[in-house]
Amino acid sequence: MDSEKVGVNYPEQFHRISRTDRRRKKKLDRAVLFFDIDGTVLSEITKEVPVSAINAMKAAQQAGHLLFINTGRTICSIPPEIRRLKFDGYLCGCGTYLTYQDEVLFSSSIEKKRGKEILKKATECNLGVFAEGQEDIYYPERMSRFDGLESSRRYFHRRGMGMEQSIEKGDFIYDKIFLYEDERSDLKS
């Protein structure tokens, strides 16, 4: 609507801001889209990436949008079927690792000595624990009473991970831990 047709005279400054805002809007037409892996990109039923999802993601990239995986998993545990999709970047390990176009922009790991202390304390408190790093996943040597931990161990063992080194050895650097607790756990220590 033309301002003069309705009897309103906006100052020239308003028109300049409007043009600037239009330019900003054009820049904002490009979005960054974040996708989780489990149950989002990778079907929990078929354990595959649906063709419809692949087509939608390709269309989004062709439209100029950036696609990122945003997952609690660490970078080493991203399945090959996800990596083949050519995402623009990965935000992994609950925010501990960020890449964009194959360049690491941020990485935060727990220092080795401190990591050993944390795992030792978790074990002393009778918690189920496994550690996730950029290189591998680390499980206890012995089977755990926690079904979730053992289910995770089986899943990653099938993918060739979590078998090289146990948390008891502790000669590794990791980014995060996953804890399990129950009535036998000591949460007060």
PLM regions and their residue ranges:
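Conserved acidic, metal-coordinating active-site core of Asp-based
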Residues: 121, 127, 132-189
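Non-catalytic pre-domain segments flanking phosphatase-related domains
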Residues: 1-35
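A general structural motif
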Residues: 28-30, 64, 126, 172-174
